[in-house]
Amino acid sequence: AWGKNQFNNAFPIALACFMFSQQIKPIYIRLEKRNTEHNYIAVDQIFQINPLDPQAFFAFEHSYHPYTELIIGKTPAIDVVISNLQNSQIINAFEIKLTAIPDNTTAILSDHLQGCEIVIRPDTIVYLALSIAKIFQQNSSVLLDILDPICARISDWEDVTSIKPMIPVFCELLYTIFDRYQSAQIPILLQPIWKTQGKLSILHENCLDLFVWSNFALAKVFLDASIKPSEKSITRPERTTVWLIKMLYDFAQNGKIDYKRTLDRITFNLKNDKAFAASGMVTRKYMNSPELHNPRIKRHLIKHIIINGGQRYLSPERRLDSAIVSTPSLFEDGL
């Protein structure tokens, strides 16, 4: 059987390859003047290589070595690293989030109000920080000029009472970076969606599609949840905002990011199992589109995505696997 991560990472790449073969462009969610906007973007433009080229190689759960010089310690693994076997060049890397629509919070709503939950892990925020730091690699003093007037005032980054009032200011600092360097944002996260018939584990006829988030657009999700601070303790999105600012400030000062120290020490009594989660009620406003309401890949086309009998390696205890296994007719030749 395929392990959970094997399927959850390999299936989305197979979906992207299939969409490329059919000339169907994923939806690119990017930041434009502090709001998210959608564009269509070709898969080969995302990957920076023809995904069907025999020289295109996909390494799952590997470190992305181009960021090694920006970091203290070992670069954390990312879901997929893409390279060109012809010249051994590492081209790109992405986090992958295979998500179901609707989620529990939107399952009883009509199609145009449904959304999918997305859970972001801490290492994704590390890669988000690295992708921004890369912009300033040749001139980190520019980043320091933006951050230092505020960040230099902070004597203890682990103290809730001193950090909490600063979080809206941190949000504004990040938006200042995004405003000035909008053209430098890059794709960072692949989010395939698979649609079911309400709460049933039955695939919708309009079943699959692919969204791609830029690094700046992904940051907007937790910034929007942080810009008006909660009255009580620091929330996960707020902590994520602090993580990002602290890692960028470290880079601006020292030219490297000590991500393990940041994640391990700045906890605010929250577990580090995830950076933050956003329910379908939240994500739908960023993803709202005809493709979210009616994904473009029909369910009978799954047999062209999972090929060579791959369905026999599925694990039915997982939701998407179960939905596919429960519909064996998907792989009949007549469809």
UniProtKB/Swiss-Prot annotation:
The keyword Nucleotide-binding does not apply. Disulfide bonds: none annotated. GO terms for biological process: DNA restriction-modification system. It comes from the Bacteria. Keywords: Endonuclease, Hydrolase, Nuclease, Restriction system. It catalyses: Endonucleolytic cleavage of DNA to give specific double-stranded fragments with terminal 5'-phosphates. GO terms for molecular function: DNA binding; type II site-specific deoxyribonuclease activity. The keyword Heme does not apply. Its EC number is 3.1.21.4. Transmembrane segments: none annotated. This is Type II restriction enzyme HgiGI. It comes from Herpetosiphon aurantiacus (Herpetosiphon giganteus).
